[in-house]
Amino acid sequence: MDQPVLLTGAGGRVGQAILGHIGDAYDWRLLDREPLSDEKIPDSVDSTEVYVADVTDETAVRNAMDGVHAVIHLAGDPRPEAPWDSVLRNNIDGTQQMFDAAVDVGVEKFAFASSNHAVGAYETTDRTPDMYRPHHEFRLDGTELPRPSNLYGVSKAAGETLGRYYHDHHDISVVNVRIGNLTQHHPPKEYERGQAMWLSYRDCGHLFECCIEADYDYEIVYGISDNDRKYYSIDRARAVLGYDPQDNSAEFTFEGEPLDEA
């Protein structure tokens, strides 16, 4: 791919998982509201391609966006307990600003980092904790309506809806990735819910690489590894994006140790 890929929120965990996997595979532009330390920037990325800016800054966003082919939009307030004024500014207004700039400069693909919190209220007391265990039949597949568990989840559902609007009215390809529980090296320890929605760094990088490479219109997919215990379906991500996850929380003990070492 000759044109750059813009990655917002590049210094966060998801951004670092992506860059750790495919940091040398693309011509990146990186944007974060905080200066990135050298270890967070791939060697192949020139300092002129690193932007320190807020996604609500229209001028900065458009400068960073100019000439890019694809956008991976991660930036925002990631706190589940974030108050409304913060999610409104950073997650909703900021995402709208990103979409608006993207269509103005002719971006072809836009991958939006949604969240499990956009559907967290499906985890009702009559379903939990059984739904976190292997062989339970309950599945969310991306066709269900949002059911947020907090205001952060509301903001992510709003981002998905913004994507629907911009796809329908401006023909930009949009994929919303409802990210599960991203941890490095091993699944969350002694946490059934986290192990059911575990996303490894390796699979995270691969999934967003698929978002850059695949052809799609408007999609909602789940971002988890191929866990035995799961209540999110990854069938759509496999079929549309070519996602082929390699990791499985069942390959670790409940305490997070690899089974072949336990």
UniProtKB/Swiss-Prot annotation:
Q: Which domain of life is it from?
A: Archaea
Q: What happens when the gene is disrupted?
A: Deletion mutants do not grow on glucose.
Q: In which pathway does it act?
A: Carbohydrate degradation; pentose phosphate pathway
Q: What is its EC number?
A: 1.1.1.388
Please verify whether the record's keywords include Oxidoreductase.
Answer: yes
Q: Where does NAD(+) bind?
A: 90, 115, 152, 156
Q: Which Pfam families match?
A: Epimerase
Q: How does activity depend on pH?
A: Optimum pH is 8.5.
Provide the GO biological process annotations. glucose metabolic process; pentose-phosphate shunt, oxidative branch
Q: Where is the active site?
A: 152
Q: List, alphabetically, the NCBIfam families matched.
A: G6PDh_Azf
- Family to which the UniProt record says this protein belongs: Belongs to the NAD(P)-dependent epimerase/dehydratase family.
- Subunit notes for this chain? Homodimer.
HAMAP family tied to this protein: Glc6PDH_archaea
Name recorded for this polypeptide: NAD-dependent glucose-6-phosphate dehydrogenase
Task: Please name the source species.
Answer: Haloferax volcanii (strain ATCC 29605 / DSM 3757 / JCM 8879 / NBRC 14742 / NCIMB 2012 / VKM B-1768 / DS2) (Halobacterium volcanii)
Lineage start:
Archaea, Methanobacteriati, Methanobacteriota, Stenosarchaea group, Halobacteria
